[in-house]
């Protein structure tokens, strides 16, 4: 299938043949949800930790005798019912990672890219290059393409410090190379702009 290419000025600049298996896949909302949740869960640190009654320091001696005081019996001052005592169901470090195999991951990315294209939220440009790190110049490119809340995806060799510096101060705008794209970044932005090189690299990765 052929897709239209735009110049950075927003004008038509030819067409590009792309793989239907990547850009014409069926929309699978359940798969996308599962992969996105798994991806975000894997980003959790899971380092929260509390101490149980056996881990809190002190409390080795019985605070008062078993009978005769009129008070409730107690064996340690580090019981959860005491101030400075341990926690009843103490949280411990854990991993929140969920297993996602390669077929599921690539299927979710294909589904997202295809839906972006079908809904008119994907734009393809010849290349994205800036000679100097100027936010004003990058903003003019965004305005010319008529996109907002946008993720720019460029080829690995196309990514440069100028692109990063020019875009980092713009709200709801991000730039990454084709290796760094993931289901979360693709669904977080309203629009996606890809260069020809990025598309070829994505196809090599997913086909």
Curated annotation (Swiss-Prot):
Q: Which GO terms describe its molecular function?
A: rRNA binding; structural constituent of ribosome
> Which intervals of the chain are annotated as region Disordered?
48-70
Pfam families for this protein: Ribosomal_L4
Q: Give the UniProt entry's GO cellular component terms.
A: ribonucleoprotein complex; ribosome
Its quaternary organisation is: Part of the 50S ribosomal subunit.
Q: What does this protein do?
A: One of the primary rRNA binding proteins, this protein initially binds near the 5'-end of the 23S rRNA. It is important during the early stages of 50S assembly. It makes multiple contacts with different domains of the 23S rRNA in the assembled 50S subunit and ribosome. Forms part of the polypeptide exit tunnel.
Q: Which family does it belong to?
A: Belongs to the universal ribosomal protein uL4 family.
User: What is this protein's name?
Assistant: Large ribosomal subunit protein uL4
**Species the sequence originates in:** Francisella tularensis subsp. holarctica (strain LVS)
